[in-house]
Amino acid sequence: PGLDDKVLTEWNGMMLATLAEAAALLQRPDWLAAAIKNGEFLINQLCTESGSISIRRSWHQDGNPRAQHAALGADLAQLVDGFTRLAEATGHAIWITHAKTIADKLLSDYWDAENGGVFTTPHDGEQLIVRQKDVMDNATPSANSTAAFALYRLAGLTGDERFTHHADQILQLLSHIAA
């Protein structure tokens, strides 16, 4: 059978958040070191800057390591959550900087200015008949539920009310579904 060696940004963002929080709660420096290594990999391999940050959805190690496919809203939301939790666990400002940069990208490229919430694809992505917006959690949390939680945490660390405002708008959107 073939080997599936791809690294998914969304899932690694979830793992980053989990490792960082567990390391802090259980006082496990080895887990914190693994979280830092994961965070560095995500920044170095899946986030590139060429005038503006570009985040990729997956990475392959098939003899020619490469990142490919534009990220989805869930990828960015999970990265914001992961880097925010890593900042909380380490106390290092660099992770807040990464979380803020990615949150800014999420809000500039994926935000639905008309109805609130995060679209699945960026504004400059493939033009589909309907632009999807995940609002229900499935096997993984939706981009919108993750973004709301991550933006509130990031607002708490940075004092940036923009993040609180956008998180509030996401919860307003989700409240219509929960009602």
Report the location of each language-model feature.
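Glycan-recognition and catalytic cores of secretory/periplasmic carbohydrate-active enzymes
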Residues: 1-179
